Each structure stands twice: as structure tokens, then as C-alpha cells.
């Protein structure tokens, strides 16, 4: 194994396919990690961020491991761009669930579990300025779509075009010298052209899917088997929405995401 950070190693975690060609093979997937090394005094104690990152990449790995497709090119993460992050972001939800944390997040000397008050503080901290962060991501998606839905070559003033694209989501006064477009590499050279919305859409999907588990128990074997059979094993053999409905029984809604991010609760409180 090679799970710890090395000086000459790229600083990221990833899931990778190892076998892609054969008549009939079991999927072989690796999760390449970059965890903090142990020291002379302590073992390798993972940060919450490292746990979340591992769960994220493990979700991608499960997508490949459970593949049951006829063609390798349609297996695992070979799906629509706005669907590929569902399994990975779904798994991240477990990182702040007490029932999950109590299975391994124990003090390395005393075996004491994380106090419930700590877990609650972690959950609340994740929702700090969640509504603002949501609007920020939505604004980036709107700008992306504004550029890539133009039927003709772009010849307009960049700052003015950007300002108009953001009319519906402006929260703060604009700075005259600011221009997001010139540093928005994701949609110019990063592979997210006309697809930046997929970040927020993936959150809608993973929150809705995890809510299904929360309603029935986060380790519910029946729901987990549905997730594996109806969604993970199918790869890109069907349209993503059809796969999701086969698993969930309905199309996703935004309510689960709003509740997870504390936005729905805040709105209700402000109305009271």
C-alpha cells in the first residue's frame, strides 16, 4: 500500500481503473490516497477533510467495482458529466453521521467516541454561509450558460456581459475592476464548458439520495442494494434520470439539499 503523502507525489486523491479490456472481467479499481503520515509519537490520524476526501473517491470506486455492463466504455464513471459525481458526493454525507463516525472515529488512546456535541458543531459549521455559497455556485452556472448559449461569436464587452448574466443573483454591489470571466478556467479550459451547473446539480442528487437512506436508516441493506443494482451497476447504459427514478422511485427535488444546508430551516425561522 502507498497511502501516505510523499514529497514527489501529486497532492490529491483519486480513483483509477486498472483493467479495461478483456472478454469478461471483474472490475479492478484503486483508490490512490495522500494521507498525513504518522509521526514518532502518533499514528496517522485523519482529519475530517481527509475522511471526506476518502469517502468521495471511494464513491467513485464503488461506481466502478459494482459495474455490470456489457461494454466497459459504459461502466462506472462513464456517465453523463452531470451525473458522475452522484456516488462520490453521496458518500461524503456519511462523514458527519454519528452512526457512521461511531464505528471508527474513536480516540486513538482511550477508544472514546467523538462527543455528540462535537459532531453537532461540525454539522453546523458546514452550513456557515451556506445560502451565500449556494448563490455563488448558481451565479457561476448562469455565467457559463450565458456564454455557451449564444448562437453567434462573442463580440460584446466582457464585464457588461458578465454583469447582465448575474442580474438575477446579485447580492452585493459590483466592484468596477472585478471580472470573473478572465479567471474562470473551469469553463474555458477545464472541461466544464456549458456544464458548470453540474456541481450544484450533483448536490441536489446526492442530498435527495441520502435523504432516502436517512428516512430508512443510513445502513439500510434494502436501500443500499437498490442503490447498487438500479444505479451503480448500470453505469451509462441508461439516461441518468431513468436510473435515478429506478432507485428513488421519483425524480429528485431540492428540498433535501435546502434542509441539509440549513437553508430551509433558516427561511422558516425568518418567517416565524
What function would you assign to each model-found segment?
Residues 1, 5-272:
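Cation-handling catalytic/transport regions enriched in His/Asp/Glu
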Amino acid at each position: 500500500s502507498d497511502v501516505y503523502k510523499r514529497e514527489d507525489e501529486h497532492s490529491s486523491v483519486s480513483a483509477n481503473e486498472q483493467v479495461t479490456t478483456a472478454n469478461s472481467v471483474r472490475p479492478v479499481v484503486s483508490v490512490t490516497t495522500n494521507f498525513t503520515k504518522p509521526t514518532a509519537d502518533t499514528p496517522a490520524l485523519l482529519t475530517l477533510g481527509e475522511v471526506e476526501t476518502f469517502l468521495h473517491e471511494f464513491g467513485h470506486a464503488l461506481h466502478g467495482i459494482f459495474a455490470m455492463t456489457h461494454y466497459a466504455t459504459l461502466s462506472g464513471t462513464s456517465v453523463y458529466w452531470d451525473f458522475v459525481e452522484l456516488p462520490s458526493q453521496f458518500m461524503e454525507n456519511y462523514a458527519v453521521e454519528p452512526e457512521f463516525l461511531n464505528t471508527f472515529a474513536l480516540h486513538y488512546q482511550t477508544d472514546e467516541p467523538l462527543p455528540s456535541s462535537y459532531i453537532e458543531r461540525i454539522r453546523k459549521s458546514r452550513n456557515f454561509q451556506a445560502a451565500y455559497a449556494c448563490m455563488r455556485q448558481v451565479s457561476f452556472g448562469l455565467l457559463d450558460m450565458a456564454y455557451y448559449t449564444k448562437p453567434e461569436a462573442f463580440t460584446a464587452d466582457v464585464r457588461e456581459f458578465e454583469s447582465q448574466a448575474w442580474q438575477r443573483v446579485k447580492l452585493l454591489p459590483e466592484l468596477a475592476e472585478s471580472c470573473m470571466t478572465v479567471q474562470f478556467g473551469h469553463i474555458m479550459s477545464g472541461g466544464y464548458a456549458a456544464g458548470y451547473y453540474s456541481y450544484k446539480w450533483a448536490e441536489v442528487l446526492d442530498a435527495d439520495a441520502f435523504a432516502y437512506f436517512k428516512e430508512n436508516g443510513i445502513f439500510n441493506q434494502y436501500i443500499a442494494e437498490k442503490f447498487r443494482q438500479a444505479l451503480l451497476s448500470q453505469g451509462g447504459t441508461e439516461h441518468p434520470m431513468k436510473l435515478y427514478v429506478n432507485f428513488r422511485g421519483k425524480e429528485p427535488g431540492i428540498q433535501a439539499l435546502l434542509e441539509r444546508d440549513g437553508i430551509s430551516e433558516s427561511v422558516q425561522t425568518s418567517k416565524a
